[in-house]
């Protein structure tokens, strides 16, 4: 399908997509979010990425989920999204929910991973620069860091909101107990956590044991990643493993 160079969003894009509140907040997210984990790096044609993003937005997908290390290489998904954002979506920024994260390895040295205030603030600044944005709508701590006090990590998230870098903050892959601890600290600081992003699929149902109830009790929304088990729950692998697939490229 040929796409015009100048993008005008579909006028009917909100008619069929359901939108749900995230926890106890007023933030509404679409039932489907587009994650940019593996398919928006420099190993994919930019025009293909552009078509995917346009198609998603035209169908009411307003939430685009990124992280500092998405690619490959690391950082390239945000940079590519920033290019497309500037070309196609700048007039629609107020209609988009853009999220980023930090926590996993991003660069060598002691300041390139984890949950320290140093890493999270610097990473958020770098993500904003790559995407050409003044702020992100949601910023997550990407994974628990046993080497950093949870008080420091949550205080850094609070700072990102108070400094205008993020509107909402959340966590990813936290256990129920750690989620409760983090939310207690966040409430005391005055910036409650809005959302939790765990892995969840028919093959991976760990959040049903306790996390879903914990998030409901704590007023947090839940948004799953890898809901199709990175393609294993589709027909992608019924006839073998294509070399171009994530499994074939050892990206799972």
Predicted ranges, named:
Residues 44-48, 76, 80, 111-119, ...:
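Alpha-helix N-cap and loop-to-helix initiation/capping positions
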Residues 1-96, 162:
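N-terminal binding-site loop/beta-alpha segment at the start of enzyme catalytic domains
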Residues 27-32, 60-62, 90-96, 133-137, ...:
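Short, well-ordered coil/turn segments that N-cap beta-strands
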Residues 22, 34, 49, 56, ...:
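Conserved, mostly hydrophobic/aromatic
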Residues 85-89, 128, 161, 183-186:
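Conserved hydrophobic residues forming the short capping helix/wall of the S-adenosyl-L-methionine
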Residues 23-41, 99-112, 135, 140:
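N-terminal small/glycine-rich loop or linker at the start of catalytic domains
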Residues 43-57, 114-132, 179-183:
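Short, acidic/polar
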Residues 2-16, 144-252:
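Beta/alpha (TIM)-barrel catalytic core signal, keyed to glycine-rich beta->alpha loops juxtaposed to Asp/Glu
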């Amino acid at each position: 399908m040929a796409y015009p160079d100048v993008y005008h969003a579909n006028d009917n894009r909100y008619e069929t997509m359901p939108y749900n509140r995230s926890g106890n907040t007023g933030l509404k997210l679409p039932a489907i979010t587009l994650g940019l984990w593996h398919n928006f790096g420099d190993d994919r044609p930019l025009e293909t990425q552009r078509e995917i993003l346009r198609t998603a937005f035209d169908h009411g997908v307003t939430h685009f989920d990124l992280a500092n290390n998405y690619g490959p290489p690391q950082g390239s998904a945000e940079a590519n999204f920033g290019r497309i954002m500037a070309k196609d979506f700048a007039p629609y920024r107020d209609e988009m929910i853009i999220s980023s994260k930090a926590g996993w390895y991003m660069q060598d040295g002691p300041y390139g991973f984890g949950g320290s205030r140093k890493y999270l603030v610097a990473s958020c600044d770098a993500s904003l620069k790559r995407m050409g944005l003044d702020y992100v709508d949601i910023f997550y701590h990407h994974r628990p860091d046993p080497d950093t006090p949870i008080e420091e990590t949550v205080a850094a998230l609070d700072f990102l909101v108070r400094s205008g870098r993020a509107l909402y903050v959340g966590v990813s892959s936290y256990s129920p107990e750690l989620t409760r601890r983090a939310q207690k600290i966040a409430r005391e600081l005055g910036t409650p956590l809005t959302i939790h992003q765990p892995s969840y699929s028919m093959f991976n149902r760990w959040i049903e044991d306790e996390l879903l109830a914990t998030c409901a009790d704590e007023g947090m929304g839940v948004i799953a990643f890898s809901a199709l088990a990175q393609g294993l729950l589709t027909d992608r692998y019924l006839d073998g493993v294509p070399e171009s697939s994530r499994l074939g490229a050892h990206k799972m």
